[in-house]
């Protein structure tokens, strides 16, 4: 077998493989004999039909089968001999196979890039440092109470954080427009749900009042016919309401699974959850900086086939989030929506993979156990979740992969230029939410 390797462009390779005539002849005769033994031909006992007749009847299909078998086998042999690692499905281009003659075919494919990670000491990380303060805990308690609050009539003018109930009719140039009319519409003032100027026009008004508000729709408003248009809303204010927060009593506290109903136990549970959330957010922000620095210091080509696979995976994830993964009536989400993220994911995967290979990082059993136990704390019965993971090899392997990735990130962090920055719980969590 003769093999030549050509770099056509970037990571694209073309193999030209020539298989000698004697191997083709041997392969052809083997296939011909097999067909002769298994095919039933009228007038002949099984396996006794003349080969010339077999060739006449099945010659084309035998040649096609031989070509397929020869290409598959010798392509794999060529990859091993040339130490090539293909990405995606190859494109095979055969010439005509003629028994007794050399057979030449070409195979086009992409390969993974060969590189060494470098400049790790040039990666800069600003490591946020934060704790859960008593003030953070009290704020979370108030948020929890607000989430379970009821609304009661307020004998006061409309103000931020109060809820109003209203009827309104919107018009542009004296004409009502679609979607501009509602009855019994509830709105918490200060939430910023409405177009600029709408909520401000309600502030200071009282239940029972009727009034007009003049606003201008933003230029980037979703309805094309309303972009930049001046509008008038005729409003009748039905109610002004305020939140009635539940008391922090045993009945309220037990709703959250705190059996003794004490404020101290509730605070302890909330603090534990906040600290877990903070730890994950801090870890995520450091990881993001590490990966961004790694990408910046190591510019590598990525195989188009790998990016295409990642684009499809991201598309399916998006459809699942919309609950439309199995629907036939969902419009195709274009590749462009996912291209940049897919390329980044592939680059990160290749770079981290090389770090793991170079540093010979293996999953640490203790770390795997810690990861599973940490995940399990979010469930009602953590021990049951831990047992489930250790009894499920697929899930366990997923956690091993996470452990290896964590260890790789820790190695990269140890090589980077790290400075610490004091910050707050809210800043860390808000930043994590914005990045999600």
UniProtKB/Swiss-Prot annotation:
GO terms for cellular component: cytoplasm. InterPro entries: PPIase_dom_sf, PPIase_FKBP_dom, Trig_fac, Trigger_fac_C, Trigger_fac_C_sf, Trigger_fac_ribosome-bd_bac, Trigger_fac_ribosome-bd_sf, Trigger_fact/SurA_dom_sf. Residues 161-246 form the PPIase FKBP-type domain. It is an enzyme of class 5 (isomerase). It comes from the Bacteria. It is found in: Cytoplasm. The keyword ATP-binding does not apply. Keywords: Cell cycle, Cell division, Chaperone, Cytoplasm, Isomerase, Rotamase. Pfam families: FKBP_C, Trigger_C, Trigger_N. Consists of 3 domains; the N-terminus binds the ribosome, the middle domain has PPIase activity, while the C-terminus has intrinsic chaperone activity on its own. HAMAP family: Trigger_factor_Tig. This is Trigger factor. It comes from Tolumonas auensis (strain DSM 9187 / NBRC 110442 / TA 4).
